[in-house]
Amino acid sequence: MKIAISMLLLTIITSAWAQEKSQSDLGGLLPADAKVEKLAGGLQFIEGPAWMPAGFLVFSDIPADEIKKWDGQNVSTFRAPSNNSNGNTIDGEGRLISCEHSGRRVVRMEKDGSLTVLADSYQGKKLNSPNDAVVQTDGTIWFTDPPYGIPKGQKQEQGHNYVFAIDAKTKELHAVASDFDHPNGLCFSPDEKKLYVADSGKPRHIRVFDVAAQHTLENGKIFCAIDKGVPDGIRCDKDGNIWSSAGEGVQVFSPEGKLIGKILVPEAPANLCFGGADGKTLFMTARTGLYSIRTNTTGARGIFQGGTR
Ligand code: MG
């Protein structure tokens, strides 16, 4: 009897340890000694991290009206004014794509520093306030358009909070989803057959779609729900796991939508991206602070293209 009880206790202790272990390293996605590090503070409200091919991080400070640069040591101004940019991503040619709140448009920064407007209206009406974007291998740019950043005194002109795609060849803007409350972060699976879109409005969940020809979405379903806070920025790693911002930090889900674990962060991250010299650092923009943690994985899109998928 005593032996049976001892065995039972041992089993309970071992399984509790295993659970603790799997939560701390996220089933091997993080090194065992990985720790959240604060890289910079004193910012206003930061969003949209993107790792530039030149080897530094950019991110938006929305109220400060600047895109910032973190060079591994210091934070400086990368572009100002930014028209209160929010989400940033990198295209296949290494160019920075930015979603502007007060500009109510999506822009691309060319190699000479000039900006090209990629989208600012749909059916003759102003966009709401583009929030986040992702670029497909063929160059099609997908972005979300909730109304969070419409400047005071201006009106919402669109009848929906759309998810849009800018066709790589024709440059035409297509509404690909109109039934989101507040569509926000988005990312592709490694094979680009699935698109994940966060809804940071009432549903507080992430939906997944099959990507069909002619940039249309099919078979939409709920992928996962966020239990604390809302899903804002999301990223996919090379194995198809989804890393989502949430109220208490970052929540990581398997390709089947099962919660693998959480990374707790002192401030609530609004967005995240993979980057660093080897692509294995996860950067998190969290209110007034920029944070990072080392991982054992990379973004679905690889190292020098922003790791943004
Ligand atoms: Mg966002």
Give the location of each predicted region.
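Blade-level signature of beta-propeller repeat domains, shared across WD40, Kelch, NHL, RCC1
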Residues: 271-309
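Blade/loop signatures of beta-propeller domains
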Residues: 19-35
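A short beta-strand motif characteristic of beta-propeller blades
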Residues: 36-40, 74-79, 116-123, 172-177, ...
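A short loop-to-beta-strand structural motif that recurs across blades of beta-propeller domains
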Residues: 66-68, 105-107, 162-164, 205-207, ...
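Short loop/turn segments immediately following beta-strands, especially the blade-tip
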Residues: 209-216, 295-301
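Beta-rich, blade/repeat-based domains predominating
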Residues: 40-56, 81-100, 104-105, 123-143, ...
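Beta-propeller domains
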Residues: 56-77
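Short, conserved, GDST-rich strand-edge loop motifs in beta-rich repeat architectures
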Residues: 143-158, 295
